């Protein structure tokens, strides 16, 4: 399989997986806001194959969502792309420049901050248009709804991406789909595994609490 064919196949595979997890994995978080894990797939693709892969997959998945399951039209599609890219592409760009454990952690943390800041601004500017709410009403939801949602979303994205990266790249190398030089070989310290695991557990507990389950 030549490089161009492999890139097309990889992009299509990631887009298909990301779309499936959107369809089957939507979780209510706060009010009308739902979390889906597609950004984990998109970010893993970017960390392994570069930020352009993250961008391409996020566009493809968002367009498919728009014409199948989304009710928010083109503006909702754009919001999806901006949200995914602000996290995934930020992480992938930083990791591409520094393919080390520190680079991966820095990228994920920077992606989390970027997504929260970008989406707070975009929710204020764009959400009133496609939601049909007055901007004043949306502004009142920024702190009690949009901020915790984006913090939880970025926490889950960063945590699962970190924990899944090594196992997935190991499988890809063993199957010959990824060269040994294509990924960083450093082992993840136990402390970071525990940290990101704790982040995931905390986010899940908060979501359950917000939904009145616990």
Please tell me what each predicted stretch does.
Residues 1-214:
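Loop-helix junctions at membrane interfaces
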């Amino acid at each position: 399989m030549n490089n161009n064919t492999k890139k097309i196949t990889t992009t299509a595979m990631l887009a298909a997986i990301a779309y499936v997890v959107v369809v089957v994995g939507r979780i209510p978080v706060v009010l009308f806001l739902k979390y889906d894990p597609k950004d984990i797939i998109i970010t893993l693709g970017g960390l392994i194959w570069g930020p352009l892969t993250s961008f391409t997959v996020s566009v493809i998945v968002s367009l498919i969502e728009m014409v199948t399951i989304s009710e928010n039209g083109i503006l909702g599609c754009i919001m999806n792309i901006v949200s995914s890219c602000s996290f995934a592409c930020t992480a992938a760009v930083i990791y591409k420049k520094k393919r080390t454990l520190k680079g991966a952690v820095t990228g994920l943390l920077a992606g989390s901050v970027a997504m929260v800041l970008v989406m707070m601004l975009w929710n204020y500017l764009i959400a009133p248009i496609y939601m049909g709410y007055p901007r004043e009403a949306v502004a009142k939801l920024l702190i009690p709804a949009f901020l915790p949602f984006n913090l939880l979303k970025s926490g889950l994205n960063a945590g699962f991406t970190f924990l899944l990266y090594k196992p997935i790249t190991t499988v890809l190398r063993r199957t010959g789909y990824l060269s040994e030089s294509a990924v960083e070989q450093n082992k993840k310290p136990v402390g970071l595994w525990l940290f990101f695991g704790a982040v995931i557990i905390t986010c899940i507990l908060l979501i359950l609490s917000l939904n009145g389950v616990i």
